[in-house]
Amino acid sequence: AAERLLDETNAWLGIHPLEAWPVVGTPDSEQRFVAYSQWLTASGAPADVVQELSARQRRRSRHFTEQRVTRELEDGAYLPLPGRKLRVVWTPGHTAGHICIADEDHEILFTGDHVLPTIHPNIGAFADRPDADTLGGYLASLEKLAPWGEYQICPGHEYHFRGLAERSAQLRARLAGRLEEVAAARAAQPDATPWEITAGLRWRRGWDALENTDREDALAATRAHLNHIDHTDPTKSAN
């Protein structure tokens, strides 16, 4: 879709530099497939799950094409749109290069996947950054949006709303509760793999009811919590 817009209109594609590799890179590269399978295996996923999800990843890659990024959007920059003051706010967490856009003239904040009215965005440590403190980055990004707290929030999903501070507090509280649960699970089973820890956590539909694609997201989220524990408390041993 992006390629068609670029070809048939005067539109341009702009992303944060850290978003470049998953968008612009070649998603069918063998190196990426190997890294993905290694990430699943290192996390303790069963061999049949690794095989299923790796095959799915290859099938999905056939629908991707290399994107032509025409502008890199740095934190604090303004979009090159005459007559508008649209400020780029870098908010890593959901992805490394996630950005929000602040419309300073109309007091609107476009939050993408960063802050949603009821959904909790997936904050995971996937194969592209398996050891990164993505959760710590997300929490810092929530704080970063405080100056736009009175703006109307227009997210990438659901509906627009007001009350950024209240919603951010809800998100932080939920993550804090999950951190406690993950830390307790690790303490109870210090030799457990991330997959085993994930399987033992509470899930709304229950772990056994989840498809393997959903389990992958759950695994990435658990790894993000484990990474945050390791980054904030060096006495914790990494899994």
Specify the residue positions occupied by each region the protein language model found:
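Active-site HxH/HxHxD metal-binding segment of metal-dependent hydrolases
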Residues: 1-80, 169
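Feature marks short, surface-exposed loop/turn motifs that line or immediately flank catalytic pockets
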Residues: 21, 118, 162, 201, ...
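C-terminal regulatory/interaction regions
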Residues: 181-239
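Metallo-beta-lactamase
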Residues: 52, 58-68, 78, 85-179
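C-terminal helical/coil "lid" or tail adjacent to the Rossmann-like core of SAM-dependent
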Residues: 30-34, 168-182, 204-210
